[in-house]
């Protein structure tokens, strides 16, 4: 394969249709950042930190491990797509109000993971164990996670 080859990817990003071009091995995180979506952080680049978490068809994924080519025909949501009409989403508001995070590097990934977790249909409220499991792929070096878990609990109570 010629390394200068590109593929065309048609997808929806934050509700807008896109036709993008990328090399076949390009990670989705890189492609999204090239579109100016800087909430998609490039942390570890090996799926360990969760800073690059986005939603693909409603499922939280590590976009550093997800090839851009796989986004063909998919609905992608980043933190930038969560606010509507200049108003923060319910989850964004909860994180801002609680002060659950400190430096902010992990915040976009945590918000997207929380959004996906809360969107899943359930018969019972999430338990603390389920929340911790749901956020396990998102590292935060500044906190002990309890305020983050409490924020998710608050989000669920008020949704």
From Swiss-Prot:
One GO term of the biological process aspect: purine ribonucleoside salvage
MF annotations from Gene Ontology: 2 iron, 2 sulfur cluster binding; metal ion binding; oxidoreductase activity
Residues that bind [2Fe-2S] cluster: 44, 49, 52
Cofactor(s) listed: [2Fe-2S] cluster
NCBIfam families hit by this protein: PRK09908.1
Assembly and binders: Heterotrimer of XdhA, XdhB and XdhC.
Name recorded for this polypeptide: Putative xanthine dehydrogenase iron-sulfur-binding subunit XdhC
Biological classification of the source: Bacteria, Pseudomonadati, Pseudomonadota, Gammaproteobacteria, Enterobacterales
Record gene name: xdhC
